[in-house]
Amino acid sequence: MNIIEQLEREEVARLAKTIPDFEPGDTVIVNVRVKEGERTRVQAYEGVCIARNGGGLNESFTVRKISYGEGVERVFPVHSPMIDSIKVVRRGKVRRAKLYYLRDRRGKSARIVERSDRSDKAKAQKAAAATAAE
């Protein structure tokens, strides 16, 4: 094992941040700490994850949303202290790792179909029902 990889793993373990599993195509809400003068507040940024880049401590993801008819993209480092929390709202069904083609799309053609796989809650209920039946 590389020394740098080992140091990165230790740092990620030290940060102990719970980051949900999300992929490009998923709609996420990123709560970002914003400092205005002396005050610090949390601002929600909701959009579609169009890319994930890097790995380890340097991993980042790009979120795209439409604000007042204008497309806005923002790149967030996954392990940034400015990120308060990340929540996955819905899972998207896509065939690409980078969804940059959404930049040129408008309206219905920019929609992403929701993935039909069962949610964690549904999986847990099914497992509980299976154990109760036995």
Curated annotation (Swiss-Prot):
InterPro entries given in the database record: Ribosomal_bL19, Ribosomal_bL19_CS, Ribosomal_bL19_sf, Translation_prot_SH3-like_sf
Alphabetical keyword list: Ribonucleoprotein, Ribosomal protein
Low complexity composition-biased segments: 125-134
Record field: compositional bias (Basic and acidic residues): 111-123
An annotated GO BP: translation
Function comment: This protein is located at the 30S-50S ribosomal subunit interface and may play a role in the structure and function of the aminoacyl-tRNA binding site.
HAMAP family for this protein: Ribosomal_bL19 (MF_00402)
Family from the record: Belongs to the bacterial ribosomal protein bL19 family.
Protein's name according to its UniProt entry: Large ribosomal subunit protein bL19
Source species: Methylorubrum extorquens (strain PA1) (Methylobacterium extorquens)
Name of the coding gene: rplS
